C-alpha cells in the first residue's frame, strides 16, 4: 500500500491505513495523479 508521497490515481487507490490520497492544487482533472499523505489521528 502507499505511504508518504506514493502516487495514487484517486481516492479509491490503496493508500496505507492512516493515509489518504491528496491531490496537488494543479491536479484539477479526475485523471490527474495525487499522492498518499498521512492523516491526523490513529488508524
Curated annotation (Swiss-Prot):
A molecular-function term among this protein's GO annotations: toxin activity
Keyword Secreted attributed: yes
Location of this chain's protein in the cell: Secreted
Maturation and modification: Contains 4 disulfide bonds.
Annotated tissue distribution: Expressed by the venom gland.
Main location: secreted
GO cellular component, one term: extracellular region
Highest rank taxon of the organism: Eukaryota
Disulphide-bonded residues: 1-16, 8-21, 15-36, 17-43
Keyword Protein transport annotated: no
Entry keywords, A to Z: Disulfide bond, Knottin, Neurotoxin, Secreted, Toxin
Domain commentary: The presence of a 'disulfide through disulfide knot' structurally defines this protein as a knottin.
Stated role: This toxin blocks the neuromuscular transmission, and also acts on muscle. It exerts an effect of first exciting and then inhibiting the contraction of muscle. This toxin is active only against mammals.
Family: Belongs to the neurotoxin 35 family.
Protein name: U5-hexatoxin-Mr1a
Organism (species): Macrothele raveni
Amino acid at each position: 500500500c502507499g505511504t508518504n508521497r506514493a502516487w495514487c490515481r484517486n481516492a479509491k487507490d490503496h493508500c496505507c491505513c492512516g493515509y489518504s490520497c491528496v491531490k496537488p492544487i494543479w491536479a484539477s482533472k479526475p485523471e490527474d495523479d495525487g499522492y498518499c499523505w498521512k492523516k491526523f489521528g490513529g488508524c
